[in-house]
């Protein structure tokens, strides 16, 4: 039986009632800087500027950020009645949802919170209504930690069972981006599965793609692995296919920013490349994400808005801030942050806190609604 995770991990979200501090992940691993979140504008900027990133962490930070900002305004008299608090909460949720478009966790979380805010009693005192929202936001955080733990256990058990069926007692995993403690409330999704394998002594090695242009794999995933002495090999993004050809990779495990009704998955740019290569090389690819990442309202990846960011993220050195690409009147830069992996390329399964759904033999390969409906 898999042991329950209990190890200490990095914290990117430091929350106590009335206080929220977020780790500026753009500065890792060279600097460890926490920013105070005092206003709704603060949390919007933190998400937009990618100081906080990772779909689950974005949602949790948004909920807690709005809670702290509301509590402060109620305490200093800017919000004088329960109705004013209720109105502020609803408009704040709408505003924060404009920060980034692709990760569905943010929208699922804030839409759910808005529905619960509508049910609050506006005739109560401002502080009382604000406190009611604080408790709702804290539940978002607590639930995400529990989701992490479920994903870890289910994913590790499933992958290890498949390896044992082939006579292997330990496994090597390939992943992309950062899907660990820095991207969630505690342990992670895809990297959480890696963590559980490591905690149970069943991880041979994790291979981390550098993940251009923000280098989340090189800067963040490697940073997490080094902190816990998890055996890790960093590779250039373009080396993944050669890795699958020349070394034994038991599975590719990736995270998700949105999983559509049919299983099509939006994730960090480069995930689609890995999926195509994994299919060719006969390596199972798994998507690990909480049910808050499932989007039953979007039929397929064709309907997902893909965020595109500034060209400078590609042309400028992240550390020195110097341009390292030649310029000219006919040069253009295309910088999509995410891509869509079609469900037929998710050959291993979708891992959630509820278990692992393996693909069907033919299309539709996944039924996301049935995962949500599970007890």
UniProtKB/Swiss-Prot annotation:
Top-level EC class as recorded in UniProt: isomerase
Cited InterPro entries: IF-2B-related, IF-M1Pi, IF_2B-like_C, Initiation_fac_2B_a/b/d, M1Pi_N, NagB/RpiA_transferase-like
EC number: 5.3.1.23
Single GO MF descriptor: S-methyl-5-thioribose-1-phosphate isomerase activity
Cystines in this chain: none
Gene Ontology biological process terms in this record: L-methionine salvage from methylthioadenosine
Location within or outside the cell: Cytoplasm; Nucleus
Predominant place of localization: cytoplasm
The keyword Nucleus appears for this protein: yes
Catalyzed reaction equations: 5-(methylsulfanyl)-alpha-D-ribose 1-phosphate = 5-(methylsulfanyl)-D-ribulose 1-phosphate
Site residues, Transition state stabilizer: 177
Function in brief: Catalyzes the interconversion of methylthioribose-1-phosphate (MTR-1-P) into methylthioribulose-1-phosphate (MTRu-1-P).
Family in the record: Belongs to the eIF-2B alpha/beta/delta subunits family. MtnA subfamily.
Protein name: Methylthioribose-1-phosphate isomerase
Species this protein is from: Leishmania major
């Amino acid at each position: 039986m898999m042991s329950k995770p209990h190890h200490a991990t990095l914290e990117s979200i430091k929350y106590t009632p009335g206080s929220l501090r977020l780790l500026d992940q753009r500065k890792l691993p060279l600097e460890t800087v926490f920013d105070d979140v005092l206003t709704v504008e603060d949390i919007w900027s933190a998400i937009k500027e990618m100081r906080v990133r990772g779909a689950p962490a974005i949602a949790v930070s948004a909920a807690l950020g709005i809670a702290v900002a509301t509590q402060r305004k109620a305490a200093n008299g800017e919000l004088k009645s329960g109705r004013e608090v209720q109105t502020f909460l609803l408009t704040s949720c709408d505003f924060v949802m404009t920060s980034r478009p692709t990760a569905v966790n943010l929208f699922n979380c804030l839409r759910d919170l808005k529905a619960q805010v509508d049910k609050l009693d506006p005739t109560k005192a401002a502080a009382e209504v604000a406190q009611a929202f604080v408790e709702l936001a804290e539940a978002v955080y607590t639930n995400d930690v529990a989701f992490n733990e479920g994903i870890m256990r289910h994913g590790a058990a499933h992958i290890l069972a498949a390896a044992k069926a082939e006579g292997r007692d330990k496994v090597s995993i390939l992943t992309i981006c950062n899907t660990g403690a820095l991207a969630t409330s505690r342990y992670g999704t895809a990297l959480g599965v890696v963590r559980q394998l490591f905690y149970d002594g069943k991880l041979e090695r994790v291979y981390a793609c550098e993940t251009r242009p923000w280098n989340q794999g090189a800067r963040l995933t490697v940073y997490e692995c080094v902190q816990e002495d998890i055996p890790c090999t960093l590779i250039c993004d373009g080396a993944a296919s050669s890795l699958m050809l020349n070394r034994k990779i038991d599975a590719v495990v990736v995270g998700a920013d949105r999983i559509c009704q049919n299983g099509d998955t939006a994730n960090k740019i480069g995930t689609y490349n890995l999926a195509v290569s994994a299919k060719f090389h006969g390596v199972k690819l798994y998507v690990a994400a909480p049910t808050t990442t499932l989007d039953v309202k979007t039929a397929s990846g064709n309907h997902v808005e893909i965020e595109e960011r500034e060209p400078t993220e590609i042309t400028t050195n992240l550390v020195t801030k110097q341009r390292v690409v030649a310029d000219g009147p006919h040069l253009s830069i295309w910088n999509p942050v995410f891509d869509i992996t079609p469900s037929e390329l998710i050959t291993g399964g979708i891992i959630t806190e509820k278990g692992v759904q393996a693909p069907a033999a033919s299309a539709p390969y996944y039924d996301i609604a049935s995962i949500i409906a599970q007890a």
